[in-house]
Design a protein with these regions (language model features):
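Transmembrane alpha-helices and adjacent helix-loop boundaries
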Residues: 3, 9-378
Length: 378
């Protein structure tokens, strides 16, 4: 046998077993020691007496609120299938009231026999919002879907076509108005905000200063003032065109939200190192290609949490349209308990509206988190 041949490792069975046990012990993670009650208590409630006292008080208040809410909503509540008269003897929620008044809360004063029209419109807007937020379809299908949804909104809500009765704008209330103003204004605010952010970041004074003034003015005045301008002043400025209150409110909301979106995107643009511009330009990319392929994806990823917060705040602020004569869910909820026999059930109406807002804003938050994760992986 040659010298280069390796000789076999000859060990006794006892030595081989000991070696195996050593290797197994080295690779097996030891279990952490069990915490004593004192250690668990300090980790859960704090190290000092003050921290423990505060935590116990907060826990007690939380448990009390949970119990009171459960008692009101379930234990002492009147079931939805019971007669509304049974609510008089109940100490909890009156769900028959909500079952009876839900159509009024959702669709307001829209004619009763035609309430299928705002129902179809709301379903289309919700479907397109979900398809856009969660990217279920390509952008071409999104554009086609939004155009179709907006056409349906105008035709079904207003009527006059397909032998539909004409419904004046004053009777467009509730959920379809909230979805229309909330989703469309925020969707249109994204390109407006992007253009404003790019103009404000520009070195050309002709673009920089007008964009800066526009953004700071809109961010410096309250939303109510902007809505008053849109509903009462803007129609006078475009007197040649008949502009209804809901479309006037939509126009000013687009630019109002666009100003906040612009600042969110500008912060994302400023977080990108200048060296990335120079490196991409050195590879032969044009400025538009650098912006589209290198800078904007990173800027949007960086600004996604701020954009999500702006979207949620803007969607909730849509309720302020009630101050200019338009009626969203909060306003129609007040209509539902306007009669004397229902006035004691205002809480049920507002809980119903709050659940709707919570679900819709939760979807926006989920979509923002998913977009941020998707951009991070790409």
């Amino acid at each position: 046998m040659s010298q280069n041949d390796s000789s076999p490792d000859i060990r006794s069975p006892r030595a081989a077993l000991d070696s195996s046990l050593v290797n197994t012990a080295a690779t097996t993670a030891s279990k952490p020691p069990r915490k004593t009650f004192r250690q668990w208590w300090r980790a859960s409630f704090g190290q000092t007496r003050t921290a423990v006292l505060i935590n116990l008080v907060v826990m007690g208040v939380t448990l009390w609120l949970v119990w009171k809410s459960l008692s009101w909503a379930v234990l002492f509540a009147t079931a939805p299938w019971q007669d509304p008269a049974a609510c008089q003897q109940s100490a909890g929620a009156c769900w028959p009231f909500l079952l009876e008044k839900a159509p009024l809360i959702l669709f307001g004063t829209f004619p009763y026999d035609d309430r299928w029209r705002p129902l179809v419109v709301s379903a289309c807007l919700l479907l397109m919002s979900a398809a856009t937020l969660f990217q279920w379809v390509t952008w071409k299908w999104q554009v086609a879907g939004w155009v179709t949804s907006l056409m349906l909104f105008s035709l079904l809500m207003g009527g006059g076509a397909w032998d539909l009765s004409i419904v004046p704008n004053a009777q467009w209330n509730g959920l379809p108005v909230l979805l229309f103003l909330g989703t469309v204004s925020l969707a249109a605010a994204l390109p407006v905000g992007l253009m404003l952010a790019l103009c404000r970041n520009s070195n050309l004074n002709l673009l920089h200063w007008p964009a800066t003034v526009f953004i700071e003015v809109l961010r410096g005045i309250p939303m109510v003032a902007v809505l008053f301008f849109g509903v009462f002043v803007l129609p006078l400025l475009v007197g040649a065109f008949k502009l209804s209150a809901i479309y006037a409110a939509l126009i000013v909301l687009v630019f109002f939200h666009g100003a906040y979106v612009a600042e969110d995107l500008r912060s994302g643009l400023q977080s990108i190192p200048r060296g990335q511009w120079e490196a991409a330009s050195a590879m032969g990319l044009r400025k538009t290609q650098v912006l589209r392929l290198v800078i904007l994806p990173q800027a949007i990823q960086s600004a996604t949490p701020a954009l999500t917060n702006t979207a949620i705040g803007g969607f909730k602020d849509t309720s302020l349209i009630v101050l200019v004569g338009l009626h969203d869910l909060v306003s129609t909820a007040k209509m539902s308990f306007a009669e004397a026999q229902w006035q004691r059930y205002a809480l049920e109406a507002y809980v119903f509206v709050g659940v709707i807002f919570f679900v819709l804003n939760g979807l926006i938050a989920m979509a923002g988190k998913r977009l941020e994760s998707r951009l991070h992986h790409h």
